[in-house]
């Protein structure tokens, strides 16, 4: 299903201080949930804690009622959670297509299903099709980020964690990335995304949380954030 619950989470430490101090949020199946906030608010730390790179000091993380707080990333991956970090998570020595095939191998599908997943990736990101036989080291930064996202999507995740999907990308590529996220949401994939592109995050998310200093400062459905966008942008970028 992909229902994620984070309850009173404290995690991530800098010089003995918790980055996340008391985070409670819900991500409903088949929705896009956006997380915004100023730099240093703990947004990326939240995704790392959910994926098992950081273990909570306090609190609980659960998927469909199952406690995953103490699981390692490879165990969480087996549950159908995929993580797209801010930097490109690809194998530079492999070609574009080999990276996608490696992602598809995770689900151990038959050849027809793998071919279908690759075709969907190429349809969503035509530049990857044009470069399918190039080594990943030859890609631009934007192309590498597209490949990083596509590689995780071919694993057919139940829950997708995406960190800063629009950072450093040209506007045209940002549109392609978000169009793909909306497409997979329509196919039932649950998405939790962090993005400094607040306008875009508000536009695509069904529900949003704004973090500040490791806590949830504001939450609500898209319409609430859209109605107060100027105030929210100011608070999210500068902190209140």
Residue positions per predicted region:
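Conserved ABC ATPase signature
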Residues: 135-139
């Amino acid at each position: 299903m992909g229902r994620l619950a984070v309850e009173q989470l404290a995690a991530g430490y800098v010089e003995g201080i918790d980055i996340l101090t008391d985070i409670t949020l819900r991500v409903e199946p088949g929705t896009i949930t956006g997380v915004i906030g100023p730099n240093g608010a703990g947004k990326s730390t939240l995704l790392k804690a959910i994926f098992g790179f950081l273990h909570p000091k306090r609190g609980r993380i659960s998927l469909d009622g199952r406690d995953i707080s103490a699981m390692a990333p490879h165990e969480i991956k087996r549950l159908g959670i995929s993580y797209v970090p801010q930097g490109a998570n690809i194998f530079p020595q492999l070609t574009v297509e080999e990276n996608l095939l490696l992602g598809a191998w995770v689900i151990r599908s038959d050849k027809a299903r793998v071919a279908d997943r690759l075709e969907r990736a190429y349809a969503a990101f035509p530049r990857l099709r044009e470069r399918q036989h190039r080594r990943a080291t030859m890609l631009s930064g934007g192309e590498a980020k597209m490949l990083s996202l596509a590689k995780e999507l071919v694993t057919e995740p139940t829950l997708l964690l995406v960190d800063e999907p629009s950072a450093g990308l040209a506007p045209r590529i940002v549109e392609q990335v978000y169009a793909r996220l909306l497409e997979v949401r329509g196919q039932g994939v649950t998405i939790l995304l962090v993005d400094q592109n607040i306008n875009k995050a508000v536009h695509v998310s069904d529900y949003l949380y704004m973090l500040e200093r490791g806590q949830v400062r504001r939450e609500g459905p898209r319409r609430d954030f859209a109605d107060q966008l100027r105030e929210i942008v100011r608070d999210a970028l500068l902190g209140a």
